[in-house]
Amino acid sequence: MELLKATVLFTITAVVEIVGCYLPWLVIKQNKPLWLLLPAALSLALFAWLLTLHPSAAGRTYAAYGGIYIAVALAWLHWVDGVSLTRWDVAGATVAMVGMLIIMLQPASA
């Protein structure tokens, strides 16, 4: 259950972080309206707060979160940007997720 809760929290955190970075990219690269910077800043503040909700040490949290972030970023690439994923994208995300699971499932006494 803890793994499921952490995975859901990591996924929400990743989406919020990506939104916070994607909106300024739209402003800079695609000349979208400047007001998009306000929800971007709010999104990044929410991202920082969400990271504090994770129960393990900060460094371990960030390391495990990285695996989820990679998978969510590739999902964003596919669903939002409309880019087809390659087998290399899928393989890389799989390796990252395995790494996340190794970190998250380590024994408490390790």
From Swiss-Prot:
Q: Name one GO cellular component term.
A: plasma membrane
Sorted alphabetically, the keyword list is: Cell inner membrane, Cell membrane, Membrane, Transmembrane, Transmembrane helix
Stored SUPFAM superfamilies: Multidrug resistance efflux transporter EmrE
Record membrane topology = Multi-pass membrane protein
- Alphabetized InterPro entries for the sequence: UPF0060 (IPR003844)
Localization per Swiss-Prot or TrEMBL: Cell inner membrane
Tell me which domain of life the UniProt entry assigns to the organism this sequence originates from.
Bacteria
Give TM regions: 8-28, 33-53, 63-83, 90-110
Which Pfam families does UniProt cross-reference here?
UPF0060
**Family as reported in the entry's similarity comment:** Belongs to the UPF0060 family.
Q: Which HAMAP family match?
A: UPF0060
Q: What is this protein called?
A: UPF0060 membrane protein Veis_0342
Organism name:
Verminephrobacter eiseniae (strain EF01-2)
Q: What is the lineage of its organism?
A: Bacteria, Pseudomonadati, Pseudomonadota, Betaproteobacteria, Burkholderiales
